[in-house]
Amino acid sequence: MSETLDQWRAGLTLGFAPGHAGRTVLRERAHYGPMLVQRALYPEGPQVCHVAILHPPSGIAGGDALEIRVDVAGGARAALTTPGATRWYKSNGRQASQDVHLRVAAGGRLDWLPLESIFFEEADALARNRIQLESGAAAIGWDLIQLGRVNQSGHWSQGRLHTATELYVDGRLLWVDQGLVGAQDDVRRQVSGLAGFPVHAALWSFGPRLDAEQNEELAGLMPWSDTLRGAATTMPYDATQSLCLVRCLGVHMEDVRAVMTDAWAYLRPRVLDTPAVVPRLWAT
Protein backbone atom coordinates (compact mmCIF):
# COMPACT_ATOMS: atom_id res chain seq x y z
CA MET A 1 0.00 0.00 0.00
CA SER A 2 1.14 3.54 -0.61
CA GLU A 3 2.01 6.15 1.97
CA THR A 4 2.44 9.89 1.89
CA LEU A 5 4.81 12.13 3.78
CA ASP A 6 2.21 12.96 6.43
CA GLN A 7 0.48 9.62 6.94
CA TRP A 8 1.41 5.97 7.34
CA ARG A 9 0.00 2.85 5.77
CA ALA A 10 1.48 -0.07 7.65
CA GLY A 11 0.71 -3.73 8.12
CA LEU A 12 2.12 -6.84 9.71
CA THR A 13 1.29 -10.53 9.22
CA LEU A 14 2.66 -13.18 11.58
CA GLY A 15 2.15 -16.93 11.45
CA PHE A 16 3.19 -19.33 14.22
CA ALA A 17 3.43 -23.09 13.77
CA PRO A 18 4.78 -26.11 15.65
CA GLY A 19 8.32 -27.04 14.73
CA HIS A 20 10.71 -29.82 15.69
CA ALA A 21 10.66 -31.28 19.21
CA GLY A 22 7.82 -29.12 20.50
CA ARG A 23 9.34 -25.81 19.42
CA THR A 24 7.07 -23.02 18.18
CA VAL A 25 8.47 -21.22 15.15
CA LEU A 26 7.62 -17.90 13.52
CA ARG A 27 6.90 -19.44 10.15
CA GLU A 28 5.41 -16.41 8.43
CA ARG A 29 6.49 -12.79 8.76
CA ALA A 30 5.50 -10.13 6.26
CA HIS A 31 5.11 -6.39 6.56
CA TYR A 32 4.64 -3.18 4.67
CA GLY A 33 5.33 0.31 5.94
CA PRO A 34 6.94 1.16 9.29
CA MET A 35 5.63 -1.79 11.31
CA LEU A 36 8.12 -4.50 12.21
CA VAL A 37 8.89 -7.19 14.75
CA GLN A 38 12.02 -7.86 16.71
CA ARG A 39 13.52 -11.31 16.39
CA ALA A 40 11.68 -14.22 17.97
CA LEU A 41 12.74 -14.93 21.55
CA TYR A 42 12.29 -17.95 23.80
CA PRO A 43 12.60 -16.79 27.43
CA GLU A 44 10.28 -19.61 28.56
CA GLY A 45 11.95 -22.30 26.50
CA PRO A 46 11.27 -23.50 22.96
CA GLN A 47 7.55 -24.14 23.41
CA VAL A 48 6.51 -20.46 23.59
CA CYS A 49 7.63 -18.00 20.90
CA HIS A 50 7.79 -14.38 22.11
CA VAL A 51 7.60 -11.52 19.61
CA ALA A 52 7.57 -7.74 20.16
CA ILE A 53 5.66 -5.61 17.65
CA LEU A 54 7.21 -2.25 16.77
CA HIS A 55 4.73 0.48 15.82
CA PRO A 56 5.73 3.54 13.76
CA PRO A 57 8.36 5.31 15.87
CA SER A 58 6.69 8.69 15.62
CA GLY A 59 3.33 7.40 16.90
CA ILE A 60 -0.03 7.27 15.11
CA ALA A 61 -1.58 10.44 13.71
CA GLY A 62 -4.48 11.50 11.50
CA GLY A 63 -4.83 9.45 8.32
CA ASP A 64 -2.58 6.60 9.49
CA ALA A 65 -3.98 3.11 8.91
CA LEU A 66 -2.38 0.10 10.60
CA GLU A 67 -3.28 -3.57 10.28
CA ILE A 68 -1.99 -6.55 12.28
CA ARG A 69 -2.77 -10.18 11.46
CA VAL A 70 -1.70 -13.06 13.70
CA ASP A 71 -2.32 -16.75 12.96
CA VAL A 72 -1.47 -19.44 15.52
CA ALA A 73 -1.64 -23.02 14.26
CA GLY A 74 -2.65 -26.00 16.35
CA GLY A 75 0.17 -27.06 18.66
CA ALA A 76 1.88 -23.64 18.53
CA ARG A 77 2.22 -21.21 21.45
CA ALA A 78 2.85 -17.51 20.88
CA ALA A 79 3.16 -14.47 23.16
CA LEU A 80 3.01 -11.00 21.60
CA THR A 81 3.56 -7.62 23.19
CA THR A 82 4.95 -4.17 22.42
CA PRO A 83 8.11 -2.58 23.86
CA GLY A 84 6.30 0.60 24.89
CA ALA A 85 3.06 2.54 24.78
CA THR A 86 1.32 3.22 21.47
CA ARG A 87 0.71 6.97 21.13
CA TRP A 88 -2.17 8.39 19.12
CA TYR A 89 -1.73 12.07 18.24
CA LYS A 90 -3.75 14.94 16.81
CA SER A 91 -5.87 13.89 13.84
CA ASN A 92 -5.88 17.14 11.82
CA GLY A 93 -9.33 16.24 10.55
CA ARG A 94 -8.46 12.68 9.45
CA GLN A 95 -9.26 9.60 11.47
CA ALA A 96 -6.45 7.18 12.32
CA SER A 97 -7.16 3.46 12.55
CA GLN A 98 -5.72 0.16 13.70
CA ASP A 99 -7.25 -3.21 12.86
CA VAL A 100 -6.08 -6.34 14.69
CA HIS A 101 -7.04 -9.83 13.48
CA LEU A 102 -6.17 -12.78 15.71
CA ARG A 103 -6.77 -16.39 14.67
CA VAL A 104 -6.00 -19.40 16.87
CA ALA A 105 -6.60 -22.98 15.75
CA ALA A 106 -7.65 -25.82 18.03
CA GLY A 107 -4.68 -26.74 20.19
CA GLY A 108 -3.04 -23.34 19.69
CA ARG A 109 -2.22 -20.93 22.52
CA LEU A 110 -1.88 -17.14 22.38
CA ASP A 111 -1.01 -14.29 24.74
CA TRP A 112 -1.93 -10.92 23.18
CA LEU A 113 -0.49 -8.35 25.60
CA PRO A 114 0.27 -4.98 23.98
CA LEU A 115 1.22 -2.21 26.35
CA GLU A 116 -1.12 0.74 26.71
CA SER A 117 -2.52 3.03 24.05
CA ILE A 118 -2.45 6.73 24.95
CA PHE A 119 -4.80 9.07 23.10
CA PHE A 120 -3.64 12.68 23.12
CA GLU A 121 -5.51 15.93 22.51
CA GLU A 122 -7.59 16.03 19.31
CA ALA A 123 -6.93 12.39 18.46
CA ASP A 124 -9.66 10.80 16.33
CA ALA A 125 -9.10 7.05 16.48
CA LEU A 126 -10.72 3.81 15.39
CA ALA A 127 -9.33 0.68 17.07
CA ARG A 128 -10.84 -2.67 16.11
CA ASN A 129 -10.02 -6.20 17.27
CA ARG A 130 -11.39 -9.35 15.67
CA ILE A 131 -10.55 -12.59 17.49
CA GLN A 132 -11.36 -15.87 15.74
CA LEU A 133 -10.84 -19.04 17.76
CA GLU A 134 -11.55 -22.67 17.13
CA SER A 135 -13.02 -24.75 19.91
CA GLY A 136 -10.04 -26.23 21.73
CA ALA A 137 -7.94 -23.09 21.28
CA ALA A 138 -6.93 -20.99 24.28
CA ALA A 139 -6.08 -17.29 24.30
CA ILE A 140 -5.75 -14.31 26.61
CA GLY A 141 -5.65 -10.69 25.49
CA TRP A 142 -6.22 -7.17 26.70
CA ASP A 143 -6.59 -3.50 25.80
CA LEU A 144 -5.19 -0.80 28.08
CA ILE A 145 -6.41 2.73 27.28
CA GLN A 146 -5.47 6.15 28.63
CA LEU A 147 -7.33 9.28 27.55
CA GLY A 148 -5.01 12.28 27.52
CA ARG A 149 -2.11 13.22 29.77
CA VAL A 150 -3.24 12.26 33.24
CA ASN A 151 -0.86 14.71 34.92
CA GLN A 152 -2.45 17.68 33.15
CA SER A 153 -5.53 19.52 34.36
CA GLY A 154 -8.49 19.05 32.02
CA HIS A 155 -6.78 16.20 30.19
CA TRP A 156 -8.29 15.11 26.89
CA SER A 157 -10.65 18.03 26.33
CA GLN A 158 -10.93 17.34 22.59
CA GLY A 159 -10.93 14.04 20.73
CA ARG A 160 -12.90 10.93 19.83
CA LEU A 161 -12.25 7.21 20.29
CA HIS A 162 -14.20 4.41 18.63
CA THR A 163 -13.35 0.89 19.81
CA ALA A 164 -14.79 -2.45 18.75
CA THR A 165 -13.79 -5.95 19.83
CA GLU A 166 -15.46 -9.09 18.49
CA LEU A 167 -14.63 -12.61 19.67
CA TYR A 168 -15.78 -15.63 17.67
CA VAL A 169 -15.57 -19.34 18.47
CA ASP A 170 -16.04 -21.72 15.53
CA GLY A 171 -17.50 -18.83 13.56
CA ARG A 172 -20.08 -17.97 16.22
CA LEU A 173 -20.00 -14.49 17.73
CA LEU A 174 -19.52 -15.08 21.45
CA TRP A 175 -18.74 -11.56 22.72
CA VAL A 176 -18.77 -8.05 21.33
CA ASP A 177 -17.66 -4.86 23.04
CA GLN A 178 -18.11 -1.51 21.29
CA GLY A 179 -17.64 2.03 22.45
CA LEU A 180 -17.73 5.52 20.98
CA VAL A 181 -16.38 8.12 23.38
CA GLY A 182 -16.02 11.82 22.67
CA ALA A 183 -13.94 13.99 24.95
CA GLN A 184 -17.00 15.95 26.12
CA ASP A 185 -19.47 13.04 26.22
CA ASP A 186 -21.44 12.45 29.41
CA VAL A 187 -20.42 8.78 29.40
CA ARG A 188 -16.96 9.84 30.58
CA ARG A 189 -18.48 11.10 33.84
CA GLN A 190 -21.45 8.77 34.31
CA VAL A 191 -21.20 6.03 36.93
CA SER A 192 -22.45 3.56 34.33
CA GLY A 193 -19.68 4.71 31.96
CA LEU A 194 -16.10 5.67 32.74
CA ALA A 195 -17.07 7.34 36.05
CA GLY A 196 -14.57 10.16 35.55
CA PHE A 197 -11.55 7.87 35.29
CA PRO A 198 -9.01 8.64 32.53
CA VAL A 199 -7.74 5.04 32.31
CA HIS A 200 -9.75 1.94 31.48
CA ALA A 201 -8.88 -1.59 30.46
CA ALA A 202 -10.49 -4.87 29.44
CA LEU A 203 -9.02 -8.38 29.50
CA TRP A 204 -10.57 -11.41 27.82
CA SER A 205 -9.64 -15.06 27.99
CA PHE A 206 -11.06 -18.19 26.40
CA GLY A 207 -10.12 -21.74 27.21
CA PRO A 208 -10.68 -24.44 29.83
CA ARG A 209 -13.67 -23.65 32.01
CA LEU A 210 -13.01 -22.09 35.40
CA ASP A 211 -14.74 -23.67 38.37
CA ALA A 212 -16.63 -21.77 41.08
CA GLU A 213 -13.63 -21.61 43.40
CA GLN A 214 -11.39 -20.22 40.67
CA ASN A 215 -14.00 -17.59 39.78
CA GLU A 216 -14.08 -16.52 43.43
CA GLU A 217 -10.30 -16.34 43.58
CA LEU A 218 -10.15 -14.20 40.45
CA ALA A 219 -12.85 -11.88 41.78
CA GLY A 220 -10.84 -11.56 44.99
CA LEU A 221 -7.99 -9.97 43.03
CA MET A 222 -10.18 -7.06 41.96
CA PRO A 223 -9.76 -3.71 43.79
CA TRP A 224 -12.52 -1.25 44.64
CA SER A 225 -11.52 2.22 45.82
CA ASP A 226 -11.88 5.88 44.88
CA THR A 227 -8.93 5.61 42.48
CA LEU A 228 -9.04 2.01 41.21
CA ARG A 229 -11.97 -0.29 40.43
CA GLY A 230 -11.99 -3.76 38.94
CA ALA A 231 -14.48 -6.54 38.24
CA ALA A 232 -14.38 -10.02 36.72
CA THR A 233 -17.00 -12.34 35.29
CA THR A 234 -17.06 -15.71 33.55
CA MET A 235 -19.50 -16.95 30.90
CA PRO A 236 -19.65 -20.70 30.16
CA TYR A 237 -19.30 -21.67 26.50
CA ASP A 238 -19.87 -25.40 26.89
CA ALA A 239 -19.21 -28.09 29.49
CA THR A 240 -15.43 -27.67 29.26
CA GLN A 241 -14.75 -24.11 28.03
CA SER A 242 -15.58 -20.58 29.15
CA LEU A 243 -15.01 -16.92 28.37
CA CYS A 244 -13.64 -14.77 31.18
CA LEU A 245 -13.79 -10.96 31.19
CA VAL A 246 -11.96 -8.53 33.48
CA ARG A 247 -12.47 -4.77 33.49
CA CYS A 248 -10.70 -2.01 35.36
CA LEU A 249 -10.99 1.76 35.78
CA GLY A 250 -8.29 3.89 37.33
CA VAL A 251 -6.53 7.20 37.69
CA HIS A 252 -3.04 5.95 36.84
CA MET A 253 -2.05 3.52 34.10
CA GLU A 254 0.55 1.84 36.29
CA ASP A 255 -2.14 0.77 38.76
CA VAL A 256 -4.55 -0.46 36.09
CA ARG A 257 -1.78 -2.35 34.31
CA ALA A 258 -0.86 -4.02 37.60
CA VAL A 259 -4.46 -5.23 38.09
CA MET A 260 -4.56 -6.60 34.55
CA THR A 261 -1.18 -8.27 34.99
CA ASP A 262 -2.33 -9.93 38.22
CA ALA A 263 -5.45 -11.22 36.46
CA TRP A 264 -3.39 -12.51 33.54
CA ALA A 265 -0.93 -14.17 35.93
CA TYR A 266 -3.82 -15.95 37.63
CA LEU A 267 -5.50 -17.01 34.38
CA ARG A 268 -2.49 -18.04 32.33
CA PRO A 269 -1.66 -21.34 34.08
CA ARG A 270 -5.35 -22.24 34.20
CA VAL A 271 -6.29 -21.20 30.66
CA LEU A 272 -3.05 -21.64 28.70
CA ASP A 273 -1.57 -24.38 30.92
CA THR A 274 1.62 -22.31 31.15
CA PRO A 275 3.17 -20.59 34.19
CA ALA A 276 2.96 -16.81 34.15
CA VAL A 277 6.25 -15.27 33.01
CA VAL A 278 6.16 -11.48 32.67
CA PRO A 279 7.73 -10.35 29.35
CA ARG A 280 11.24 -9.03 29.91
CA LEU A 281 10.56 -6.02 27.71
CA TRP A 282 8.24 -4.58 30.35
CA ALA A 283 11.17 -4.19 32.73
CA THR A 284 13.28 -2.12 30.30
From Swiss-Prot:
Any Gene Ontology CC annotation: cytoplasm
Cellular localization per UniProt: Cytoplasm
Complexes and interactors: UreD, UreF and UreG form a complex that acts as a GTP-hydrolysis-dependent molecular chaperone, activating the urease apoprotein by helping to assemble the nickel containing metallocenter of UreC. The UreE protein probably delivers the nickel.
A Pfam family the protein falls into: UreD
HAMAP family: UreD
InterPro entries found in the cross-reference section: UreD (IPR002669)
Chief location bin: cytoplasm
One annotated GO molecular function: nickel cation binding
Record flagged with keyword Cytoplasm: yes
Family: Belongs to the UreD family.
Protein name, as recorded: Urease accessory protein UreD
Keywords linked to the UniProt accession: Chaperone, Cytoplasm, Nickel insertion
Coiled coil: none
Function: Required for maturation of urease via the functional incorporation of the urease nickel metallocenter.
Lineage: Bacteria, Pseudomonadati, Pseudomonadota, Betaproteobacteria, Burkholderiales
Species whose genome carries this gene: Bordetella pertussis (strain Tohama I / ATCC BAA-589 / NCTC 13251)
